[in-house]
Curated annotation (Swiss-Prot):
Keyword presence, Translocase: yes
Gene Ontology molecular-function annotations: ATP binding; proton-transporting ATP synthase activity, rotational mechanism; proton-transporting ATPase activity, rotational mechanism
Keyword terms of this UniProt record: ATP synthesis, ATP-binding, Hydrogen ion transport, Ion transport, Nucleotide-binding, Translocase, Transport
Keyword RNA-binding recorded: no
Name listed for the protein in its UniProt record: V-type ATP synthase alpha chain 1
HAMAP family: ATP_synth_A_arch
Length: 592
């Protein structure tokens, strides 16, 4: 279709207004100026279109041509996504570097998926088979870890006329389907508009936890596969390290990491670390299951708004194959700031703190695309997409609009605390403020799959930490010596729980990841010390004798015990029981 060319009448930073655009539609992608800068129509008034331009607009002036492509902002979905690094509108950064150097040249046009790379396609269906949207046509081994399942594109159903094994690029024809509307060609790639969620049969209630290997998360505030979580915290409290830890060790088959408006160095860290680290499940490099979207703080603001949608659309595509996906967005605050900037330039009525009135609905749109679903297709496979967003409230103020709008939507809140971070307690997740609404689902799963007293131990530990907070308040007023020995013991056990269990070193080879069976044994050992010590106190043993037991050091060092030697934690528990019994028999006054 030959569309009329419009003309620029106003340029205001990333916002460009063009007239003569009556043939264009809302959310169409347009090319602006002689350099053909990429932009998207975000508002239409008569023949005038307001366009957010995803590139630097300096040098652009009134009278410059604007051409609409007639299509919405879409991503290319096919082999070549894994291990790739894209910007916010899915331009491949490695291909841009090869073509134009270290910085993205304005107006550069590079296909998202390589048109040269050849993939070997193995069909799982044959000519004559009846297929519908979502059915798996065949497989491409994308990396040594990920098998890319080629699906029937949305909106197509019918009978396969031909489907051939062989080596293809993403745009080569691999077969044909006869539909009601005629014959459709099949390729390894499909396109999908980023602002529209991909279809599925139905949503399921999430129940299995997404194991992260982070003790404070898995034990106290678990997130399910297909769940939503947010990590708000002030600057320097460790949001990015928490996100990196989850991306490294989460029990997901594919990780989509969106660096949205954060520092470039943080994406560099990911690029440097992930290829070196081994996935505990496959033994392969973590990069072989990761898609990176880098939209750093020095890239155009408008592209931040798109980067979140680009990332979640890629996540949904892999979810449709039947995979479990973990999506990290770091940080949604920068995305909200981009919304605020565009809203201000559009002269819309501002809401709270200048954010647009539709901030809450946009956030909800994003998080609602997560979930545990039955995918389209005749085999009824399950897929899960877990969304975890970091929020950076200015000054750590959790009452600001982005945090509040996020908390209304997500079910897990990991509140990072600057006081804990200053005390070098990492991950700095505050156990008194944080919560998980998935506990009633995850608890029975843990009792069944890990240990039958998991929920009971968790409740005891939480009660102890709550009691510690109350006792510390009293100790600050009247001094620790005024507390009874039993209360001082509670403070010591809670301290052990905090320092020996909740604290975790992200940069230690062993402590960076703790499997569930190790977490259970460690928690049990700490709480067992509390129970046994209380018995000893009641039998007349002095508190200092209990606290000086050498076995306490072994409990503290249990976090550094390798997964292979996990049974040695049980030995520590036996030694603890024996030492306390010896203390009672030597120095205690046993009840008659």
């Amino acid at each position: 279709m030959d569309l009329k060319t419009g003309r620029v009448v106003k340029v205001s930073g990333p916002l460009v207004v063009a007239e003569g655009m009556e043939e264009a539609n809302l959310f169409d992608v347009v090319r602006v100026g002689d350099e053909r800068l990429i932009g998207e129509i975000i508002e239409m008034r008569e023949d005038k279109a307001s366009i957010q331009v995803y590139e630097e607009t300096s040098g652009l002036g009134p009278g410059a041509p604007v051409v609409t492509t007639g299509a919405p902002l879409s991503v290319e979905l096919g082999p070549g996504l894994i291990e790739a690094m894209f910007d916010g509108i899915q331009r491949p950064l490695d291909a841009i570097e090869a073509k134009a150097g270290d910085f993205i040249t304005r107006g550069i046009d590079v296909p998202s998926l390589s048109r040269e790379k050849v993939w070997h396609f193995n069909p799982t269906k044959k000519a004559g088979d009846k297929v519908e949207t979502g059915d798996i046509l065949g497989l491409v081994q994308e990396t040594s870890v990920i098998e890319h399942r080629i699906m029937v594109p949305p909106g197509i159903k019918g009978e396969i006329i031909s489907l051939n094994e062989g080596d293809y690029t993403v745009i080569d024809k691999i077969g044909e389907i006869k539909t009601d509307k005629g014959i459709e060609d099949l390729t390894l790639m499909q396109k999908w508009p980023v602002r529209r969620g991909r279809p599925y049969k139905r949503k399921l209630n999430p129940s299995a936890p997404m194991v992260t290997g982070q003790r404070v998360v898995d034990t106290f505030f678990p997130v399910t596969k297909g769940g939503t979580a947010c990590v708000p915290g002030p600057f320097g409290s460790g949001k990015t390290v928490v996100q990196h830890q989850l991306a490294k060790w989460a029990d997901a088959q594919i990780v989509v990491y969106i660096g949205c408006g954060e520092r470039g160095n943080e994406m560099t860290d990911v690029l440097n670390e992930f290829p070196e680290l081994k996935d505990p499940k496959t033994g392969e490099s973590l990069m072989k299951r990761t898609v990176l979207i880098a939209n750093t703080s020095n890239m155009p603001v408008a592209a931040r708004e798109a980067s979140i949608y680009t990332g979640i659309t890629i996540g949904e595509y892999f979810r449709d194959m039947g995979y479990s996906i973990a999506l990290m967005a770091d940080s949604t605050s920068r995305w909200a700031e981009a919304l605020r900037e565009m809203s201000g330039r559009l002269e819309e009525m501002p809401g709270e703190e200048g954010y647009p009135a539709y901030l809450g609905s946009r956030l909800a749109e994003f998080y609602e695309r997560a979930g545990n679903v039955i995918c389209l297709g005749q085999d009824g496979r399950e897929g899960a997409l877990t969304a975890i967003g970091a929020v950076s409230p200015p000054g750590g103020d959790l009452s600001e609009p982005v945090t509040q709008a996020t908390l209304r939507i997500v079910k897990v809140f990991w509140g990072l605390d600057s006081q804990l971070a200053y005390r070098r307690h990492f991950p700095a997740i505050n156990w008194l403020n944080s919560y998980s609404l998935y506990l009633d689902k995850v608890g029975p799963w843990m009792n069944e799959n890990v240990a039958e007293d998991w929920v009971e131990l968790r409740q005891k530990a939480m009660a102890l930490l709550q009691e510690e907070a109350n006792l510390q308040e009293i100790a600050r007023l009247v001094g620790i010596d005024a507390l009874s020995e039993e209360d001082r013991l509670k403070l010591e056990v809670a301290k052990s729980l905090r320092e020996d269990y909740l604290q975790q070193n992200a940069f230690h080879d062993v402590d960076t990841y703790a499997p569930l069976n190790k977490q259970y044994r460690m928690l049990k050992a700490v709480l067992q010390f509390g129970d046994e010590a209380r018995k000893a106190l009641e039998s007349g043993v002095y508190l200092k004798d209990i606290l000086n037991l050498p076995v306490r050091d072994k409990i503290a060092r249990a976090k550094y015990i390798d997964e292979k030697d996990i049974l040695s934690i049980d030995e520590i528990s036996k030694e603890l029981t024996k030492d306390i019994e010896d203390l009672i028999s030597k120095g205690g006054i046993l009840d008659a």
